Curated annotation (Swiss-Prot):
Organism: Pseudomonas entomophila (strain L48)
A GO molecular-function annotation: translation elongation factor activity
UniProt-listed InterPro entries: Elong-fact-P_C, NA-bd_OB-fold, Rib_uL2_dom2, Transl_elong_fac_P/YeiP, Transl_elong_KOW-like, Transl_elong_P/YeiP_cen, Transl_elongation_fac_P, Translation_prot_SH3-like_sf
Protein name: Elongation factor P
UniProt function note: Involved in peptide bond synthesis. Stimulates efficient translation and peptide-bond synthesis on native or reconstituted 70S ribosomes in vitro. Probably functions indirectly by altering the affinity of the ribosome for aminoacyl-tRNA, thus increasing their reactivity as acceptors for peptidyl transferase.
Subcellular location field: Cytoplasm
BP GO annotations: peptide biosynthetic process
Domain of life: Bacteria
SUPFAM superfamilies: Nucleic acid-binding proteins (SSF50249), Translation proteins SH3-like domain (SSF50104)
Pathway terms, separated by semicolons: Protein biosynthesis; polypeptide chain elongation
UniProtKB keywords: Cytoplasm, Elongation factor, Protein biosynthesis
Transmembrane segments: none
Length: 189
C-alpha cells in the first residue's frame, strides 16, 4: 500500500484490477486546502492515458512487476520484437506500448533492456539510464560569444533530436540519459 504523497514516476498502481503506470506526479499543498498529488497515469494493458488527483493520505494498491533482461531482436513496421536473454523467448510489443523509450530504439542496438511483465504478460520495456548513440547530423558550432555551456541540436541515427555540447561532431558516439533525454558526454565506445 502506498499513500498519495508517496507516488512518483515509475510507480505502478492496481486500479480496477489493471496496472497503471505513474508517468508524472506533482505534489501541491496550498494554505487553505489539504495536500494533493496530481498524476498522469497510463494503463499498461490498454495504453489509455488519464490524469487523476489523489489526496496526500489516500491509500493506493501498488503492484510489483516481474522483470527480465531482454534485447531488441528486430523491428517490423510498428511491431518491436524483444528476446529474453536467458531462455531466448521472443516477445512482441506495438509502438504505442513503448512510446516512452521509442526515441532510443533502433535496429541493431546492443543495449540490454528490462522487459516488464504483469501477470505473465509483457507490458513494457525499460532501457538503461545511460545509453550510447551515434550522431548522424549536427551543425558546426558558432565561434565567438561562447561563455558558459553552449549547446546545439544534433540528430541521431533513428531521427531523434537532442541538444549536445558544441564540440560534438558528426559520427561521434555520445552518452544520453534516458530519464530526461539529456546529453551526458562523449561515449567511450
Amino acid at each position: 500500500m502506498k499513500t498519495g504523497k508517496e507516488l512518483k514516476p515509475g510507480t505502478v498502481l492496481r486500479i480496477d484490477n489493471d496496472p497503471w503506470l505513474v508517468q508524472k506526479a506533482e505534489f501541491t499543498k496550498s494554505g487553505r486546502n489539504s495536500a494533493i498529488m496530481k498524476t498522469k497515469l497510463k494503463n499498461l494493458l490498454t495504453g489509455y492515458k488519464t490524469e487523476t488527483v489523489y489526496g496526500a493520505d489516500d491509500k493506493l494498491d501498488d503492484v510489483i512487476l516481474d522483470r527480465k533482461e531482454a534485447t531488441l531482436s528486430f523491428i517490423s513496421g510498428d511491431s518491436y520484437t524483444f528476446m529474453d536473454t536467458t531462455d531466448y523467448t521472443m516477445y512482441e510489443l506495438n509502438a504505442e506500448d513503448i512510446d516512452a523509450v521509442l526515441p532510443y530504439i533502433e535496429e541493431g542496438m546492443e543495449d540490454i533492456c528490462e522487459a516488464v511483465f504483469f501477470e505473465g504478460r509483457l507490458v513494457s520495456v525499460e532501457l538503461p539510464t545511460t545509453i550510447s548513440r551515434q550522431v548522424t547530423y549536427t551543425e558546426n558550432a558558432a565561434r565567438g560569444d561562447t561563455s558558459g555551456k553552449v549547446m546545439k541540436p544534433a540528430k541521431l541515427k533513428n531521427g531523434t533530436e537532442i541538444q549536445v555540447a558544441d564540440f560534438i561532431q558528426i559520427d561521434e558516439w555520445i552518452d544520453i540519459d534516458t530519464r530526461d533525454n539529456s546529453f551526458k558526454g562523449r561515449s567511450k565506445k
